[in-house]
Amino acid sequence: MGLELSAQQQASLLDYLALMRKWNKAYNLTAINDLEQMVIRHLLDSLSILPFIGSSPVLDVGSGAGLPGIPLAIALPHQQFILLDSNGKKIRFLTQAKIDLALKNIDIVHARVEDFQPTAPIAIVTCRAFAALNAILDSTRHLLTSTSRVLAMKAKQEDTKLPAGYEQVAVHELEVAFLDEPRLLIEIKII
């Protein structure tokens, strides 16, 4: 992956996983409980899109337990991230994670994506395990400008035609260390 993180960033990522494991008992944040698998399937998977995060703000739609938003925010402390979710329990977890990890570069928003009205243009929309590609595009259309990008993390390419007004920029094959499963990043813009 070629990723270089400081000792403090590495510690923050592990603290994040510890917090997720603690809250998972009551809040059902993830089906993955094994620490090694959490590192691979949550942290490394989320961080695999780092090379594609250029400008900010970055909106993490359907953030859930904060994936990929929190690992990206830890790795990119000078970028601004907005973590959006409609589930109150997940918002409580995200808020606590922001406090415990002292993440000053994230904002937590409790709303449905269709209802979210940002105060500044969104540069990048990320999503991981959120919805089918066309549903993602339909629900985020009002957030996109001509320079915005949607970065949809998928396990496989969907055989769907993009709605009118969208162009697929690229399909990036992601390499996640210790994971022998396909991971794709589908990059889309409006035209």
Where are the regions a protein language model picked out?
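Conserved beta-strand signature within the Rossmann-like core of class I S-adenosyl-L-methionine
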Residues: T147-Q157
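Short alpha-helix immediately C-terminal to the canonical SAM-binding loop
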Residues: K90-R92, L133, T160
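Conserved SAM/SAH cofactor-binding pocket of Class I
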Residues: L44-C127, L137
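Short, conserved active-site loop motifs that form the nucleotide-linked donor/cofactor pocket
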Residues: I106, S148, V169
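A short glycine-rich, Lys/Arg-flanked "PGG" loop and its adjoining helix->strand segment in the class I
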Residues: L137-T147
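Active-site capping/gating segments
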Residues: A155-I191
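Residue-level signal for inorganic ion chemistry
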Residues: M20, L72, K154, I188
